[in-house]
Amino acid sequence: MNVPLPPIVSAQEWEAARLQLRDKEKEVTRAHDALAAERRRMPRMEVDKAYRFEGPDGPVSLLDLFEGRRQLIVYRFFYEPGVSGWPERGCPGCSMMADQVAHLSHLNARGVTYARVSRAPQESIQRLKSEMGWDGPWYTLTDDFDADFGVDEWHGTNAFLRNGDRVFRTYFVNHRGDEALGSTWSYLDLSALGRQEEWEDSPEGYPQSKPYQWWRRHDEYVADIDPWEGSLDEKIAAAQEHVRATTGASTEAPTGASAGPSTGAWSGAPTGASTGDTSGAA
């Protein structure tokens, strides 16, 4: 291979170079965490237009896309007439993005629903999903939702928050910003409430629990559309029973594994969500 490569060094020199880069990587990680904290303090934009979509079972509203959860992430997938590969295939870049999306049960466990939207009819969407092995809800656009939310000409990801029947747009990213998405953590960092873990710098009153303890194998989560409502003890017991039922094991879930803080349920978008309050844990 006639390509100019970096020099060959000893193990000690290699380790020293790696540690230098590690320090820079940690700086980037801390900057990323700080940016996500700012994102959680962005003002919200209320969505007051009644957008309609077509799902596999008929017409649905934007509120329906939440599937009862508090948060929604919507990716604009270009699959429609005029797109490369139509009707057999979807946009190559959007297809690559779909291949990268983590198992959605992990997002659901933090009260986040992930959905795709396209102009293609449902018959074509369901066929493509099956052929490509993609999971998750995928809806047909029927109005100007894509134009209103910046995804009529290019792919992009919008984040929303629900408070009762009111829906708010909380963030939007496209172009290279989309390239960083795919993992559970990347989508949670984009969401209005974040990872909901105690180390995060979030506005006071945001739901948070200990890191690691809520993590599960994707088939071991309790089916729960909102992890922040109900009794903590009840949720832990339900998680233990669910694991026993699905794995045949008698392992106990660690304290705080499947729910939020024992102080009670979070009742909606907290006061001060967009005021720059920095009282959350660092």
Features from the language model and the residues they span:
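Non-globular targeting/processing and membrane-anchoring segments
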Residues: M1-R110, R127-S130, P137, D143-A282
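Short loop/edge segments at beta-strand edges and connector loops
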Residues: S118-R119, T140-T142
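Catalytic nucleophile loop
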Residues: N108-I125
